[in-house]
Amino acid sequence: MIGKLTGRLDYRSTDHVLIDVRGVGYIVYCSDRTLAALPGVGEVVALYTDMVVREDLMQLFGFMSLAEKEWHRLLCSVQGVGAKVSLAILGALGPDGVSRAIALGDWASVKSAKGVGPKTAQRIVLDLKDKAPGVMAMGGTVAQAMEGAVEVVEVIEPAAPAPRKAAPPGGAGAATAGALSALSNLGYGPSDAAAAVAQAAAEAPEAGETDLIRAALRLLAPKT
């Protein structure tokens, strides 16, 4: 199985890219959101990947974070949801948006993705609601995937121009994971904690871990 690819971006299309890894080109299918976030042609790129092998088909799907990869795997496990629909959902909402929608039972947001009807959206939310806390707690990002990428590729192709440096790990995913961990340590159940953190993150997308914890605790406090 191929779990991650690091190489140079050779070509991009409307739904896939070609990544050159030591002279071997890999076609990787991605969501619209992931495609938009990738660097330019000729630059170093790293993607987490999921490989699908069937009798008549072998495909690689690429993701910017471990959470996105896990949501793809889970979405494809739902009856009536294939890789194309999964990528449409991730492209429309992003992994954080999928986490929020499923944790909050917001099937209307899931339905906003191309090719997703109301029944399928409701089934997704119902089947995956218990999975949201675990995915939201994942902290792997593309920045972590890029660690060492420059050195590896430059050894292979020393004449190539140096790529842009990857941003340090962190951001909304790390804040969400930290907030979930804190609420779990305080004794809150996974589903309640995930719903509270998801709502807090939706109301304040730029909030850090501490602010998310405070906001989630207010939401979880008994109503008088």
Swiss-Prot record:
Q: Which residues cross the membrane?
A: none
Name the principal localization, coarsely classed.
Answer: cytoplasm
Annotated region (Domain II), positions in chain: 65-143
State any GO BP term from the record. Answer: DNA repair
A single GO CC term for this protein reads: Holliday junction helicase complex
Q: Which Pfam families match?
A: HHH_5, RuvA_C, RuvA_N
Query: Which InterPro entries did the record assign?
Result: DNA_helicase_Holl-junc_RuvA_I, Hlx-hairpin-Hlx_DNA-bd_motif, NA-bd_OB-fold, RuvA, RuvA_2-like, RuvA_C, RuvA_C_sf
**Residue segments, region Domain I:** 1-64
Q: Which residue intervals make up region (Domain III)?
A: 171-224
Please give the superkingdom of this protein's source: Bacteria
**Single annotated GO MF:** four-way junction DNA binding
UniProt keyword list: Cytoplasm, DNA damage, DNA recombination, DNA repair, DNA-binding
Q: What are the start and end residues of every segment in region (Flexible linker)?
A: 144-170
Output the SMART domains linked to this UniProt entry: HhH1 (SM00278)
Signal peptide position in this chain?
Answer: none
Q: Give the protein family.
A: Belongs to the RuvA family.
On subunit structure and binding partners, the annotation says: Homotetramer. Forms an RuvA(8)-RuvB(12)-Holliday junction (HJ) complex. HJ DNA is sandwiched between 2 RuvA tetramers; dsDNA enters through RuvA and exits via RuvB. An RuvB hexamer assembles on each DNA strand where it exits the tetramer. Each RuvB hexamer is contacted by two RuvA subunits (via domain III) on 2 adjacent RuvB subunits; this complex drives branch migration. In the full resolvosome a probable DNA-RuvA(4)-RuvB(12)-RuvC(2) complex forms which resolves the HJ.
Quote the HAMAP family the UniProt record gives. Answer: DNA_HJ_migration_RuvA
Function, please? The RuvA-RuvB-RuvC complex processes Holliday junction (HJ) DNA during genetic recombination and DNA repair, while the RuvA-RuvB complex plays an important role in the rescue of blocked DNA replication forks via replication fork reversal (RFR). RuvA specifically binds to HJ cruciform DNA, conferring on it an open structure. The RuvB hexamer acts as an ATP-dependent pump, pulling dsDNA into and through the RuvAB complex. HJ branch migration allows RuvC to scan DNA until it finds its consensus sequence, where it cleaves and resolves the cruciform DNA.
Q: What name has this protein been given in UniProt?
A: Holliday junction branch migration complex subunit RuvA
Q: Which organism encodes this protein?
A: Ruegeria pomeroyi (strain ATCC 700808 / DSM 15171 / DSS-3) (Silicibacter pomeroyi)
